[in-house]
Each structure stands twice: as C-alpha cells, then as structure tokens.
C-alpha cells in the first residue's frame, strides 16, 4: 500500500494509508486543484506535450521570456528569492536587459549583476557590516551560478565563474550564526565538496538533512533550494556534490552508476560531525537525485528516511522520453540557441562531447536500482506538471509499489499554487512544508 496526497481545495487527502499512524489523516490546506478551468492555454498545451514527451524544463506559467528554456531558468532563479538567492528588483532589471533566447546575453547580464553584488559585499565586510556582506555574497554567488547555466565548459570564463560561485558562498557562510562551513569528502583519489550548517554548534546530536542535487546542479543550488528552511525546521543542513555535479566534471569526474560508493564516503564523514544524530538522518535527492539517492539507499541502511523529487527507477527509460531522444539530429540542430546550450552543458556532465546530446540516452543504460531493497520510510514529491507524463507516472508507481517498506507517501503539488514544475523549484516554501511536516512525523514516530 502507498499513501497518495493530492493538494486540493479543502484538504490534503491520503488516498490510501501506508502505516497505521498515518491512516485517516487530513491536513487543512487552501490549495486549488491543478485542473482549474482558468489555466492559461499555453499551460494546457505544455501539459498536453508533457504527456508524450518528458521535458524537465517545461514550464506551466510564463514569467518573462518567450524562450521557454530561458524562462524556466529565470523561474528557477525567482524561486530562490524566498531563500536569499535573489532580489526581485535585481532579477527583473537583469531580465529586462537580456536579449530573449541569447545564451551570451544571459551570461553577460547575470555576470554584471554578480560583480555588483560581490563589490557591495566586500565593501560591507570592510566596514564591519556583516549582515549586508552576507546577503550580498549570497546573491553574488547565485547570480554567478545563473550566468553559468547556458555557458559551455570550453568557454574561457567557465572555470573562473565557477570559482566565483564557490568563493562568494564560502564567504557568506562564514557570516551565518552558526557558520555554514565548507568541507571536503575524500573519495578515491579526489575530494567531493560540501557545506555543513548545524542548527547550533553545541555538540548535541540533532535531526539532519543531507541534500543531493541532480543532473545539472551545484551544491550552491542546494543551499538556495532548502538550507534556510532546513534550519528553520530544526534540522542540520548538509549538501555535497557527487561526480557529474558542480565543477567536478572539469576535473574529469562525470556521472557514475555506483552512487552507493559516493554516498557511503559522504556518510562516513558527516556521521563524525557531533551535531548529526545517526538515528535521524534523512537524505533528499532532486531531479536525477531521484536515482542517485535511492540507488544508495538500497545498500546504505544508515539512511533513516528518504525523500525524492521525483523517483527515477530507470534512467534509460526516462531519457528515451526526452526531446533529444525523440528529435532527429537535424531537428536538434535547429533548436533555439539557449535550449541547445543548456542541453549540451548537461551532456558534458555524462562524459560526452557536448554536441552529442542524443548520446545521453545510451549513456544512461544500467542506471537503475531495485526499490525492494529500500527499507526506510520514503516520501516522493512530484509537481503536477511532471506527473502528467506517462513515463514519470509509471516510474513513480513502479517505485512505490515495489518498495521494501510500507511507510511510503507520494505528494502531487498543484499547478495553481505555482508548484507544478520540475522539483517544485518555483515554490520552495510549499515543497519544504510538505517535506518537513512529513519528516517530523517520521522521526517523531521513532
């Protein structure tokens, strides 16, 4: 049995109960059903397209740009306003100066704003204005990161901007109370970068969330995705890049099937932190983290709760449903420049020539896991827009029906609360409410 939650007009309904303590539970919520009749036509068209061809960057509300790929990237940036990653005036000022659909214009304008914020941060720090310095460093890091979204790895600026993302975040982390510290996980002959921020630096073990990103994330993205909410809910926050993520591909570290070996190395390190309670360690994976983390959980029983947004049981079958798999090379060559740039940048993370975007399909063969080997409690969060895709829905069903635990829940977040896109990046508050309310219940049970 599994618990299914649809956020609707009156309540959150548990369609079927997964554990006795969760039976008949109802949570008051003002959300609207995602099939509202006043949905814009472009959203309806996108939902219809999503049913047949899965596109992670398909949006259901247009925020500013006509170029859909660019508008999705802008949407992701806007989602970080609530977590300190951007200011609405700055974001729309930059957007107003970008040539719609141009990767170069996008890079140039976001880098300009990042430089302004970094200068402001340094001045504030020099003058002892630590709060201003921290907030400015955070935004500088995120604006540098946003500039990199459409930049190819062979661009002379690529590595330099990558370093700026890290430097600004490290400086911001020093100014938190308690600080968010940068640390490294030894793995084979390299190190995996991470951030750690405890609720309090007092040596007392507490609930902890380890966040693992997806197919195109940096640990800095994960900070803006959920760090602030994690601390607010009383959990320590940790995030680490695994091979393929962040700047690791520039060192020759591309995605690998065996994420259990990478996450084992991470757990070996973080479980030595005094503030981490080994009995209350949850791990959250978004996007292709919905493969990376569950794969590890089939082996790693030190993971006490698992959250995904959403599950990817078989990468190959999912990638076969994506636009680059279904389009001919001739069609791909005619893609809008921004879409081609973003897709090529992700292709590089798989260890392929960036131009070989179709090669990603074959590259993902064997990226699978057995849900039956996962025995900890599981939460699966899916945006309504993604869930309409047949393969996405099928993989969620395969995942949940075959888990080795009866404590399993799926939540479908709604379009008309601005929570329907990939990883619910546009409504991180709602995503966090769902996650931590569930997780509080799990750890309370114990």
Mark where each language-model region is.
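N-terminal cap/lid segment of alpha/beta-hydrolase-fold proteins
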Residues: 110, 160-201
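Short beta-strand element of the alpha/beta-hydrolase
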Residues: 205-214
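Catalytic histidine-centered segment of alpha/beta-hydrolase-like enzymes
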Residues: 416-428
């Amino acid at each position: 049995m599994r618990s299914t939650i649809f956020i609707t007009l009156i309540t959150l309904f548990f369609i079927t109960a997964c554990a006795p303590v969760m039976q008949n539970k109802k949570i008051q919520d003002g959300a609207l059903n995602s099939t509202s009749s006043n949905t814009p036509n472009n959203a309806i068209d996108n939902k219809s397209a999503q049913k047949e061809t899965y596109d992670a960057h398909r949006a259901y509300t247009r925020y500013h740009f006509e170029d859909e790929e660019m508008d999705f990237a802008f949407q992701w940036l806007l989602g970080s306003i609530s977590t300190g990653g951007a200011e609405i005036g700055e974001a729309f000022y930059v957007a107003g100066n970008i040539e719609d659909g141009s990767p170069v214009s996008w890079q140039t304008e976001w880098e300009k704003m990042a430089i302004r914020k970094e200068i402001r941060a340094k001045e504030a720090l020099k003058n002892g204005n630590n709060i201003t310095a921290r907030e400015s460093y955070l935004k500088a890091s995120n604006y540098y990161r946003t500039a990199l979204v459409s930049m190819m790895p062979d661009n002379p600026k690529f590595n330099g901007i990558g370093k700026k993302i890290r430097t600004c975040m490290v400086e911001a982390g020093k100014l938190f109370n308690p600080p968010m510290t940068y640390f490294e996980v030894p793995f084979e002959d390299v190190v995996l970068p991470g951030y750690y921020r405890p609720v309090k630096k007092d040596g007392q073990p507490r609930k902890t969330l380890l966040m693992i990103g997806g197919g195109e994330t940096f640990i800095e993205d994960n900070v803006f995705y959920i760090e602030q909410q994690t601390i607010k809910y009383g959990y320590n926050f940790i995030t680490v890049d695994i091979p393929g993520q962040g700047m690791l591909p520039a060192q020759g570290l591309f995605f690998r099937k065996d994420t259990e070996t990478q996450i084992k190395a991470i757990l070996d390190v973080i479980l030595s932190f005094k503030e981490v309670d080994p009995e209350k360690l949850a791990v959250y994976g978004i996007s292709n983290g919905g493969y990376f983390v569950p794969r590890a959980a089939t082996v790693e029983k030190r993971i006490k709760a698992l959250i995904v947004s959403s599950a990817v049981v078989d990468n190959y079958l999912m990638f076969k449903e994506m636009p680059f798999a279904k389009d001919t090379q001739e069609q791909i060559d005619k893609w809008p420049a921004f879409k081609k740039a973003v897709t090529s940048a992700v292709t590089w993370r798989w260890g392929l020539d960036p131009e070989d975007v179709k090669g990603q399909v074959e590259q993902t063969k064997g990226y699978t896991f057995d849900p039956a080997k996962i025995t900890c409690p599981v939460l699966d969060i899916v945006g309504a827009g993604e869930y309409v895709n047949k393969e996405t829905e099928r993989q969620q069903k395969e995942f949940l029906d075959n888990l080795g635990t009866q404590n399993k829940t799926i939540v479908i977040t709604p379009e008309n609360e601005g929570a329907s896109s990939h990883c619910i990046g546009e409504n991180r508050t709602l995503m966090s409410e769902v996650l931590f309310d569930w997780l509080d219940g799990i750890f309370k049970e114990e």
